[in-house]
């Protein structure tokens, strides 16, 4: 199946559909998380009271970023072209669902997705776990092999690989993970151009 034949596309949000603005090092410092630890995994391992307080801080920090979000180069045009082709579109993000909705509205992409096709960290295990992609495949009644996962980081590609989907790397200057990326495009505009 070529990229032009794919009808089921799942996108990461931050850094893929939007310009990446999260300062993960600053978030780790504010939450007293070791720099080598994954933020979400670290919070999940904390005692309930401490985790709740830190999750609340993270949610408020992300809310500020959501309202100020800006679209990634060519992302809106890519999504609208895919919708015109009759493609089913989903979002799989490590962000909170409610903030994903805010972000997508802020960047003019809210009309491209059904709310139930937007999975955040509370609806699916955080990437690189494949659970979110597998959930969308089941919901859409398709095999994961017929899906593309588009993202800007190795977690997106690892998620695709683990689910049996194909991974597309975008919005980075070069392909840092050629062993994981089935396709690479420097940005969403270039990916749009590959559709023909």
Kindly give the residue locations of the regions a language model identified:
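A short acidic, glycine-rich active-site loop
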Residues: 39-43, 64-65, 122
């Amino acid at each position: 199946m070529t990229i032009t034949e794919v009808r089921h596309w799942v996108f990461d949000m931050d850094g893929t559909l939007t310009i990446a603005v999260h300062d993960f090092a600053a978030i780790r410092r504010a939450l007293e998380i070791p720099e080598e630890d994954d933020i979400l995994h670290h919070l999940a391992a904390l005692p309930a009271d401490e985790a709740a307080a830190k999750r609340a801080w993270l949610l408020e920090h992300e809310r500020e970023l959501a309202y100020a979000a800006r679209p990634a180069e060519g992302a809106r045009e890519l999504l609208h072209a895919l919708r015109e082709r009759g493609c089913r579109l989903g979002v799989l993000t490590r962000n909170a669902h409610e903030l994903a909705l805010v972000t997508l509205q802020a960047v003019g992409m809210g009309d491209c997705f059904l709310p139930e096709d937007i999975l955040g960290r509370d609806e699916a295990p955080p990437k690189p776990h494949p659970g979110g992609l597998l959930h969308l495949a089941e919901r859409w009644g398709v095999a994961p092999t017929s899906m593309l996962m588009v993202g800007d980081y190795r977690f997106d590609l690892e998620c695709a690989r683990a689910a049996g989907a194909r991974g597309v790397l975008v919005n980075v200057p070069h392909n840092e993970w050629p062993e994981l990326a089935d396709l690479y495009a420097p940005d969403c505009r270039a990916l749009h151009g590959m559709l023909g």
